[in-house]
Amino acid sequence: MYTWIVIAGGVFSFIAAMGIGANDVANAYATSVGSKALTMKQAVVLACVFETSGAVLMGSHVTNTIRKGIADYECFEDDPGALMYGSMCVCACVGMWLFIASRYEMPVSTTHSCVGGMIGMTMVIKGSDCVIWYQAKDTFPYIGGVSGIVLSWIISPLFSAIISSSFFGTIRFLILRSKNSFNRTTYLFPIMIGTTVTLNAFFITFKGAKGIGLDDTPFNVACAWSFGIGTLSAVIVYPFTGAIRTRIMSKNTTSIEVEHMECKINDNINDDNINDDNIKNKKPVCCNDLVKYINDNINVNLDTIVENNTKVNEIHEDAEVFAIETEDYFKSLQVFTAICDSFSHGANDVANAIGPFAAIYIINREQQVNKSNELGSDAYWILGFGGIGITFGLLLYGYKIIQAIGLKLCKITPSRGVAIELASAIVIITGSRLEIPLSTTHCQIGATIGVAALEDPRNCSGLNASILIKTVVGWVLTLIVVGGSTALLTAQGVYSPEIGGNKCDNQ
């Protein structure tokens, strides 16, 4: 009798996943696109592969927390339909808010959105006593429920800022500010590759894929495997450092010639009076409005955004500049860290869209509310379903948040991006292993602040205060908007038909 809720919940959860793609996936790729290590097209392709992979292989931990760690399931044992309907409302309101926030370039927290929705739904149906406000845990941070999640909202940006500033400060001191930074980078590149691979391999191995038993990997085994993989990566890269060095030098030698050629081409275009309208008119008829919209989004001119905004242009102009050749070394490293960040993002944030739908699906399948019920093999297609939604969201609307974080918040270069992405990935995967649904937005913003603050520690002139304030305001509004709208929508569906009935009398 609740099949319609399963179908509607699936649709709304897919929309919520699209909203996450439009808003939160930019957290993984904004720095790479902003530093021009990746194009928007490349970011979309990588997101499609690694967001979905992270969700399917590693997302079950956090999905369980979103699904079972906020609301007390025992309160719903006698009313499974209400929990299903309430979870559907959570998905609908989360998706709605994420698209609104993306429209106004507010990188909000999807974790805030989902948790706030679950709280609002539970309080309306069963009261505040059925919300798990506090729960003692045996592992760090030893606090579960809503209290543990709220604590993570403070800890995650703080830790991300500390780690990213430490990473970038070390890189800047040892390499970037050296007179022979290019040579130093050449010598240290295998070590940097090995270190990056080791860190990411450790957290991926230690967290593991639950379906194949890697989530039980002991700490010492994870350390041994990750160190071995990192060392092997450094050894493999070492023979190619000479070729990489030659390619970078050749690339920068010919860059001036390319710029001259582009100028001549632009002059010819102007002389021939060829404008955008002429070009658009020559497109094939099969290119419909949706294709054109997507194409415009992934080909947006990022340089124009910087030039047209006075404050953003000042931040970019005043930022410390390092050798172009040295920065080029960090591009390949940044792409790798972006992939790891994307992988961890898929593991963490797909749960925000799929957690409530997982509750709907299990209740409908088992015909009862039982906290011990697991998704089993169904987790893979459900998490994959969410990963695909995230990719579509990035494709349709992700450029908005990429502009806000990757360009407008501060100046991002490949070396800065490596520190930001690596710090964010470490905090996110650690939290996911501990079954804490961290805010990816908080981690990314915190890591970005940590790097940008090093430009001028006293005045923080490397940060765009207006963007930062708008972001914080968005975080506050998230709890109010999603929690309130979910409560209203849930109340309308659960209580309106039964005013004066048994359900109201029982509450």
Language-model features and meaning:
Residues M1-N268, D276-Q507:
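Alpha-helical transmembrane segments and immediately membrane-proximal extracytoplasmic
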